[in-house]
Amino acid sequence: MAKEITIKELTEAELIDWFYKASGTKQYVDFYVSELRKQQQPMLEINCGTGEILRRLNAEGVSCDGMDCAAEQIKICGDEISRLEYDSTLYCVDYNNFTLPKLYKTIFIPQSMLCMITDVEMATKFLTNVYNLLENGGTLLFDIYIPWKDITDYHSNKWSSGDAIENPETGEIFVYSYCCDLDLSQQIKTTNSKYELYKDGKLVSVHFDSSQSRWYNDNEMKIILENIGFSSVSFSKILKTSDLDYSTLFTATKLI
């Protein structure tokens, strides 16, 4: 009798950890690590997740702490930090209102995390709290993603064909599919996602979620940063993933 396979739902933290280890995000991590080598320590990674970038920096001897709002992801990150005997402090905070016991020379926010804050007033408050964590002369780096491919080829609630990623170490195959709805006037994208994990040709894990994101135009974000008090705001296109899709890297300095 064939063994029955139980399909379990992946937690968000397990999903992110698996995806980072198996997908082509190495290019993204490499980019950030390369940029951060030019910056001063100590550093803080906001939205550190399970710690892919943080661990790379620690391995190079960079003094870097991590912060996230997801306790489960902080736990996975902390377990790895402890196992590798790295010296990083991790903070689990409420993104709506946070402060930390120290200041930093460099703060970076990867994964276009700011796009997940769909209210401009809340995004401004978040960035103000970040500003207050920087030393005078400190630098903020973060990236913003605008979904140009979805905007130019928009089909409401049409599911994309699944993108498959294979983990060469385990042979597991990860399939990601999504459909989206766009509010162009408010710059809001609502995404319904399905993540499937296959092993030996059989579905073994699945995760569904729905999320909203807001894209910020370059000059719009520049004005937000300058109104908070940042100076020397600059931005450049980075990490092109297709003819249309790319992220924009922002850098800004706190000068009092």
What residue ranges belong to the model's regions?
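SAM-dependent methyltransferase
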Residues: 142-219
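C-terminal lobe and adjacent flexible extensions of AdoMet/dcAdoMet transferase-like proteins
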Residues: 212-256
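Residues lining the SAM
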Residues: 110-112
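Class I SAM-dependent methyltransferase "Motif I" SAM/SAH-binding loop
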Residues: 47-49
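A short glycine-rich, Lys/Arg-flanked "PGG" loop and its adjoining helix->strand segment in the class I
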Residues: 124-136
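A short acidic, Gly/Pro-enriched loop at the edge of an enzyme's catalytic core
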Residues: 99-107
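Class I SAM-dependent methyltransferase SAM/SAH-binding core
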Residues: 54-97
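Conserved class I S-adenosyl-L-methionine
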Residues: 1-41, 52
